Amino acid sequence: MINVGAFVASARSGARVVVGGDARGPVVSAARLGMKERLFAFLAHVPLLKHCDAVRRYAEQVRMENRRSLEVFVLALSKRYGPEGAKAAFDYGARRDGAPLDQRRVRNMVSIAEHFHGTGDAKPLARQMVFRSWECRGLDHPGHASLTIKNQADADAGRHVYEHVSWWPNQRLGSKEHFDRIEPKTLDGYRIDKRSEISSATEQRLREGDAARRKILADGFKYANQDERHDALFFPRAGQKLDKDAEWGLSARKVYFPAIGFNHDRRDTDRPRAFVLFGLNEAAMLRDARTVKEGAKSGELKYRMISKKENCASMALRVLRAGGAEHFVPYTAAWISEDPNHAHAYALAVQARIDALNQRRADVERRCERLRDSASVRQAWRAFSEAGGASASPLAEDAGRGRASAHMRQARLDEHAREVERIGAYFAELSAGRSGKHRDRADADLADAMKRCAPSARDDVAALTRKASVLVETLGRHLDAPPPSDSSALRRLAAHAMIGRIEAFMAAAIAA
């Protein structure tokens, strides 16, 4: 099956993408652009010559190739981003019938499909936060923003968490009430948000169109009257769909964030839970979300459409920032008023930074595992570990689940603190034992990072996140090249062990 990556790669040449094939199946490639093709492409735009048989045949052949390429590309998008994302890409990105599938169109359609499918590596995770927004197009179409905190990690569905923050005015706003502070209300779910973002007139036309198509399908086109034929042409656009209660709604742009701590992929429950080092603080976000809802009930908080603190976008951003978004990307407030577009852009920036750090962390893990493929490096690492009596068992999962006693948790924290001190002393001794001209650049960078970023049990989530990002990026840079010696490989493994200690302290910090 041809995938999206094949189209992206073929489009890089700048030529239009075509789909050919042989007995082995379809093949994506860049169209040939020789002298003959250039000549016919030029003649197809000359008024006096474009109707010549040869030119017309060439133009029709190109249109057919473009249509086939588009069909296969939309199918590939559907496989990767789902039918809704592929439909959106076709509706908004295909534009003209028979237009070439070039680099710009491929990039735009992939971007649109990603937008409707949702952005972020955390989408399949059991513990995640979803930032949703509907585009703002002015005061008449202000859009909306909301945020959902989900935790489906427990096997018992009754213990799952679904906290939705959606800030609305408690009454319909008039044209002169955009600056007024009025009573707010909060909606309890994404489905209600979707219904609220589609107008009554649009919903009526969608129902009439659906009914007309059903009648024409049942009775036959020739028995349909003019009104039914007209109504049947009104199809739902990308994002407009019926929910399970047969109500029309408009889907949002979605940005997914992971929660810090142990997590797993809902699609593969057989895989062991893994610790997510970079993410948002679920407990802190839940506390703030519930504070917001209590403020709405008590009257302490109000709604004001044009505001930097009291509209839907600012409230969604407030909860996002409570989870530690600013540990990854500094937040800059809007000049006059927050809006869903500005909020969406900030959410995307935070998501991109979090995903990049987690990908780098996973890459560091894989590369350090490869270092242990060497028997001599394994032996050196075993000797180093045994010298400190280091324990490989993490505190994190037991602490996060509340299954370890306070005494046991403290004992493990003390053990991790001793190991941090030992690794730090190892790098300090290494740094002091070499003169400037004999020091390896990678060793010097790692020693400096160890000195600045050694974790402790007193660190909060913000400090641990900052230290972890420095260590992961420093170690990641120097793992790109193979270590020149076993001793250099040992130092990289010691730095990797320090990242493991940060994970242990992070687990304790978020469980506190």
From Swiss-Prot:
User: Which SUPFAM superfamilies is this protein grouped with?
Assistant: Non-globular alpha+beta subunits of globular proteins
Q: What is its main location?
A: secreted
Key word Cell division present in the record? no
Q: Where in the cell is it found?
A: Secreted
List the record's Gene Ontology CC terms alphabetically.
Answer: extracellular space
Q: Give the residues annotated as coiled coil.
A: 347-377
Keywords on record? Coiled coil, Secreted, Virulence
Pfam families in alphabetical order: SicP-binding
The text of the family note is: Belongs to the BopA/IcsB family.
> What does this protein's UniProt record list under function?
Plays a role in mediating bacterial evasion from the host autophagic pathway.
User: Under what name is this protein listed?
Assistant: Effector protein BopA
| Source species of the chain | Burkholderia mallei (strain ATCC 23344)
* Classification lineage: Bacteria, Pseudomonadati, Pseudomonadota, Betaproteobacteria, Burkholderiales
